[in-house]
Design a protein with these regions (language model features):
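Acidic, divalent-metal-coordinating active-site segment for phosphoryl/phosphodiester hydrolysis
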Residues: 126-133
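Conserved small/polar residues in nucleotide/adenosyl-binding loops
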Residues: 156-165
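Short Gly/Thr/Asp-enriched flexible loops that form oxyanion-binding sites at enzyme active sites
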Residues: 63-72
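Conserved acidic residues
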Residues: 52, 118, 148
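Short glycine-rich phosphate-binding loop at a beta-alpha junction
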Residues: 51-58
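Active-site-facing substrate-recognition patch
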Residues: 1-51
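Short, glycine/charge-rich flexible loops or terminal/linker lids adjacent to PRPP-binding catalytic cores
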Residues: 74-120
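Internal alpha/beta core interface subdomains
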Residues: 137-154
């Protein structure tokens, strides 16, 4: 998507460790109209008749996923990184390493909101090392749901997260 490339060049920054900082429009200050155009672009790649819900990880993926879910007329579930007192009925969970926070975290999804047979589209802001996506895929599998697609706004190409994610 050319508009995304242009925004990265114009507004993005490269931080030490080759971290791409695009928090001025993607994952801190969110340009919702632009996110809507990204959702429209994603829609070209997925059969939305074959999607029951959108799944993402807390926190940076929520804005894009919520806009996609709204545009597609689907519910959105996000995997929490901390258990709260209001989660009932059991949990699906997967431990991942967060490169953002430099520590292990556990992704949690209530069994109340993800069911066997659900057809799940995973949407996230970044695919860097593939840890969040690995965890989300493990949760989908544990639920007996079906992963029907993965959409990521930005993909780091080195080291290759795509190869690690495909191998799972």
């Amino acid at each position: 998507m050319q508009e995304l490339k242009d925004r990265i060049v114009k507004e993005g920054k490269i931080l030490p460790g080759n971290i791409v900082k695009v928090d001025g429009f993607l994952n801190h200050r969110v340009d919702c109209a632009f996110m809507g155009r990204i959702a429209d672009e994603f829609q070209k790649f997925f059969d939305l008749n074959n999607v029951d819900l959108i799944l993402t990880a807390e926190a940076s993926g929520i804005a894009l996923s919520a806009i996609c879910a709204y545009r597609y007329g689907k519910p959105m579930v996000y995997a929490k990184k901390a258990k709260s007192d209001n989660i009932e009925g059991g949990l699906y969970q997967s431990e991942i390493f967060s490169y953002t926070y430099k520590k292990k975290v556990t992704l949690l999804v209530s069994k109340e909101w993800l069911h066997p047979g659900d057809r799940v589209l995973v949407i996230d802001d970044f695919l860097a090392r593939g840890e969040a996506l690995r965890g989300l895929c493990e949760i989908v599998q544990a639920a007996g749901a079906e992963l029907v697609g993965i959409g990521c706004c930005l993909l780091y190409t080195s080291p290759s997260p795509r190869d690690r994610t495909r191998s799972r």
